[in-house]
Amino acid sequence: MSALGQITITVSRCWNTERNQTDKNPCLHGAYLQLRETVKNKSTHLKKPLMKQAPPWKDHLTFQPLHPAERKTQVWRWQSGNSSDLETTSSASPWPTGSNRDVVLNTLAESCCGLSELITAPPYAGVSIQGFSQIWVLFPFCGGTFHHNEKDVLGLQDFERESVSTSQSRNISLLTLGQLQNCVIGKLTIIDLLTEHLLGVRHGVICFPWGLPSSS
């Protein structure tokens, strides 16, 4: 089995845990998600500029004060280049044509309460989701029921994923980072399924500030 590419989702955060307060001046590497696809030594990067003004959280989430760089949602843009080019910038590259990257982006966005844009929150934000007693996570090849505990991540309540029909295989939502960390089924298996289904990539890698999640 040869690797067609690699997907890397990285979260960086800048938070003074010792003093339990944010820096007065936000750093340039504040919390952000970065999705990178590498195929045949060519990289395409999905990124969002920090500090871009946008309506806060679309009234779907309540939150405690965040790092200044994380108080706003940002718009994702694709940019070609290598990892050294991922500096904060106000420029926005046009959406690519003839690809399924928009499908990937929409699928990621749907994981956040059905929002039309993707949002992020650091583990220390105390974020809670209102009006949702369950989060449905549909995978094309997964069945059965699993539980995962959210009490230590994002302040969310427990959620239960129930079995779904394979006829719903095209309706896929992605677990949020906090949920994925505490999910008690094979995390890397889920990632492989998602990346292969969405991008045709057979090998996926996901990284967290607290390290690579291990399968349970």
From Swiss-Prot:
**Misc remark for this entry?**
Isoform 4 (talanin) of ZNF365 does not exist in rodents. In primates, a canonical intron-exon structure exist, with several stop codons preventing talanin production in old world and new world monkeys. It seems therefore that isoform 4 transcript emerged during primate evolution from a noncoding genomic sequence.
Protein name (record): Talanin
Protein origin, superkingdom: Eukaryota
Q: Which organism is it from?
A: Homo sapiens
An annotated GO BP: mitotic cytokinesis
Q: State the Gene Ontology terms under molecular function.
A: protein homodimerization activity
Associated disorder, per UniProt? Answer: Uric acid nephrolithiasis: A form of nephrolithiasis, a common multifactorial disease characterized by stones formation in the kidney and urinary tract. Nephrolithiasis is due to supersaturation of the urine by stone-forming constituents, including calcium, oxalate and uric acid. Crystals or foreign bodies can act as nidi, upon which ions from the supersaturated urine form microscopic crystalline structures. Uric acid nephrolithiasis occurs when the urine becomes overly concentrated with uric acid and accounts for 20% of all stones.
Q: What is the lineage of its organism?
A: Eukaryota, Metazoa, Chordata, Craniata, Vertebrata
**What function does this protein fulfil?**
May play a role in uric acid excretion.
State the tissue distribution.
Isoform 4 is expressed in placenta, lung, kidney and pancreas.
GO CC terms in record: centrosome
